[in-house]
């Protein structure tokens, strides 16, 4: 099975303890853990700072599954949950795959921290997750809400800790097994 994981810094495996964009080691990143646990070919197309793009990513023709988790950076940069959901809907309708080949994951809600100075952003992340679920249902796309996975976030209130990556991988494997 050929899997593409498309997302932001939490997909990339960004280590917030680093100022230079370093990554956690492969034994800690959820994308790498997914590959090890399944034996699948899993490509990490995470990018630090990625917002929801206007156009579909270029996917290899042998892509069996696209795991997509985006929206955090849109909210951090002032977009409303509704604006982010509209951008996400546009993106999802551009992806040249069948609906059952896409897994949309709502990012875990942010917490107060160095990058999250107020409750409004946290509230927006909860509302965005609800919008993602509604959107997935409307488009017939499989959905998972990482907000229910108890993902540990770092001091910045945004990025997964190594424990958060392991928990994310564990819960994602459960979703993929169903």
Regions from the language model: what does each represent?
Residues 1-46, 56-62, 166:
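Serine-esterase "nucleophile elbow" of acetyl-processing enzymes
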Residues 29, 51, 161:
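Residue-level signal for threonine
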Residues 56-178:
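Alpha-helical cap/lid subdomain in secreted, periplasmic
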Residues 44-52, 143-148:
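Acidic carboxylate-rich catalytic motifs and surrounding loops in phosphoryl-/glycosyl-chemistry enzymes
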Residues 11, 20-21, 49, 73-76, ...:
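Short histidine/acidic/glycine/proline-rich micro-motifs that form metal-
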